[in-house]
């Protein structure tokens, strides 16, 4: 098996890069998907709302939190009980799939990497940092945006806005 872990600030282009990697035969997974499914059940809202930037900013839960704040709160509360809780759920989904090449579009903490390494000990793992041109801080005030700074990534993709040819060339050298 082969795993590509993508990390970068919100808006850096992680999903854009992941989608291009999918076009090369990979299957895309997000560690946040089980969180979004859980929140969808808890709030009785469509799971799609948990991925919609406008809904995450405008929808207010009964306790006054935005949907984004609520998703982060649920994720952190469960991580306090088990730091690998969401990664374990994602790893289980992968175990029951036939996919042999996986790209993670939202890698944010080391527990996710460690869980995948333990679950798939013989897998090849590639860790990639995506940097958007001119983006030095995250537009989202969340500590997980910064948790992998200083990690020794094997590759860095420079996402220069609008230069898809250069972006594709970098991706092909990794996947």
Regions found by a protein language model. Name each.
Residues 7-8, 65, 85, 89-90, ...:
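Small-molecule kinase domains that catalyze NTP-dependent phosphoryl transfer to phosphate-bearing small molecules
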Residues 33-101:
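ATP-dependent small-molecule kinase phosphotransfer cores
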Residues 14:
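Conserved lysine of the Walker
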Residues 17:
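Hydrophobic positions on the alpha1 helix immediately C-terminal to the Walker A/P-loop
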Residues 23-29:
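Post-Walker A helix-loop "phosphate-sensing" segment adjacent to the P-loop in P-loop NTPases
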Residues 27, 89-144:
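ATP-dependent NMP and nucleoside kinases share a basic, alpha-helical "lid"
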Residues 1-4:
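Extreme N-terminal starter segment of soluble prokaryotic enzymes
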Residues 11:
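Walker A (P-loop) phosphate-binding loop of P-loop NTPases
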């Amino acid at each position: 098996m082969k795993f590509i872990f993508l990390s970068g600030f919100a808006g850096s282009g992680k999903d854009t890069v992941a989608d291009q990697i999918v076009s090369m035969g990979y299957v895309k997974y997000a560690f946040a998907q089980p969180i979004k499914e859980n929140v969808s059940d808890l709030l009785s809202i469509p799971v799609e709302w948990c991925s919609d930037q406008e809904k995450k900013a405008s929808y207010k839960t009964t306790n006054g939190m935005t949907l984004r704040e609520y998703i982060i709160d649920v994720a952190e509360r469960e991580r306090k009980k088990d730091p690998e809780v969401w990664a374990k759920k994602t790893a289980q989904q992968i175990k029951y799939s036939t996919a042999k090449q996986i790209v993670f579009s939202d890698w944010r903490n080391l527990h996710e990497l460690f869980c995948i390494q333990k679950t798939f000990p013989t897998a090849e793992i590639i860790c990639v940092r995506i940097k958007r041109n001119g983006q030095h801080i995250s537009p989202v005030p969340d500590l997980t945006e910064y948790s992998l700074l200083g990690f020794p990534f094997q590759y860095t993709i420079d996402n220069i806005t609008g230069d898809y040819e250069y972006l594709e060339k970098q991706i092909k050298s990794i996947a």
